[in-house]
Amino acid sequence: MAQQQTGSRKRKAPAVEAGAGSSSSQGLAAADGEGPLLPKKQKRPATRRRLVHYLKGREVGARGPAGLQGFEGELRGYAVQRLPELLTERQLDLGTLNKVFASQWLNARQVVCGTKCNTLFVVDVQSGHITRIPLMRDKEAGLAQAHQGCGIHAIELNPSKTLLATGGENPNSLAIYQLPTLDPLCLGDRHGHKDWIFAVAWLSDTVAVSGSRDGTVALWRMDPDMFNGSIAWHSEVGLPVYAHIRPRDVEAIPRASTNPSNRKVRALAFSGKNQELGAVSLDGYFHLWKARSTLSRLLSIRLPYCRENVCLTYCDELSLYAVGSQSHVSFLDPRQRQQNIRPLCSREGGTGVRSLSFYQHIITVGTGHGSLLFYDIRAQKFLEERASSSLDSMPGPAGRKLKLACGRGWLNQDDVWVNYFGGMGEFPNALYTHCYNWPEMKLFVAGGPLPSGLHGNYAGLWS
């Protein structure tokens, strides 16, 4: 693979803390799930936890670690069902940044985010401290000036959490950073995309795929020689340098006869079990590729709801893709000709589904109206609020859909806000991104105002 190197006058970013216990490239779908997951209000001292494990093992007649693992699995399932109603919000101050589009947990304290104003930063959810990460620049740096206003739409960590993929200063280019230091490793700016990158998915620790507004998906392979430090730093002046790489494969999605100009790739999701890559395009189609050393398209399916299909996630346990649209979440099993799970309606005033994530049988839905909803795939219904009739009774369903309403965030009250929106005092934020840290039982949620002309942000830690 031909490589070129570029220097960047970047101060070295502080190393992020090791030991991340968070959701990965598919949000909830790949959360680590280490240890028993107890709601915070029900945590017990370690000695009491061990006693509970022992007694539970005796109760079911189990012996050894297998019994404990089974009980921990039960606890994890219980936590998945009960956690949403136990969460409370603490808003984070992001200053004047504009609309957070993407986020991922790096460890128990730090979340990396990308914004519409093309800012890549790490926020410490405990202290609120923000560290900006310099963006990588194309070999032809002037090209980035023509793409103001796009921003960073995707951030994904590889399975081992040693590499981070996102956009460069030019949103057409794929940037790869090393973790935990966030040193620049390489930039995919050669013979790649001709328009903005909207989505990224990792196929393995060294292979990533990007989806673009130009209607293509590109497969990138990171050379192992990049990791040995031989090209990581300029030996004389100490400037970080990075390789410039080209994709191993580029595939165009088929043109739909109904709207051939709107075949923009909006979201990607990878099935590790089947080694298949799913993609959603804005012309209302779902596409599936076999992902090996190259991409081989298997099928394209017309989606039942075709407007604003902007998010996609996959659940390995259920072998299901979930697609978020303007008013619905559709479920797809590419191996079934007849889909058995009916679409769910978000019923949020037509503001759309803006973010999705799976964990076990629960799907979390971030809406364009500033709320989080939780849907149980097995029961095929939304989680409901719980109400207790007395102190001695177990809480039961109250019959109302469980909805977490996010705070106001920050809104720039500029001329656009005054002239076009009448100076509305309350303006809900679209929840463009959310990610779970299951071992810490935390949920990071972020976004900003839905209208493109408004400038603002929201970020909150739910725990």
Swiss-Prot record:
Per UniProt, which keywords does this protein have? Repeat, WD repeat
| Gene3D superfamilies, per database record | YVTN repeat-like/Quinoprotein amine dehydrogenase
Homology family: Belongs to the WD repeat DCAF12 family.
Any one cellular component term from GO for this entry?
Cul4-RING E3 ubiquitin ligase complex
The coiled-coil regions, if any, are none
Q: Which SUPFAM superfamilies match?
A: WD40 repeat-like
Stated name of the protein: DDB1- and CUL4-associated factor 12-like protein 2
Q: Where are the WD repeats?
A: 89-137, 138-184, 185-252, 253-297, 298-341, 342-401, 402-445
Tell me which PANTHER family the record gives.
DDB1- AND CUL4-ASSOCIATED FACTOR 12-LIKE PROTEIN 2 (PTHR19860:SF8), DDB1- AND CUL4-ASSOCIATED FACTOR 12-RELATED (PTHR19860)
Q: Which residues does the annotated region (Disordered) include? A: 1-48
Q: Where is the composition biased (Low complexity)?
A: 15-33
Q: Does the keyword Repeat apply?
A: yes
Q: Name one Pfam family in it.
A: Beta-prop_DCAF12
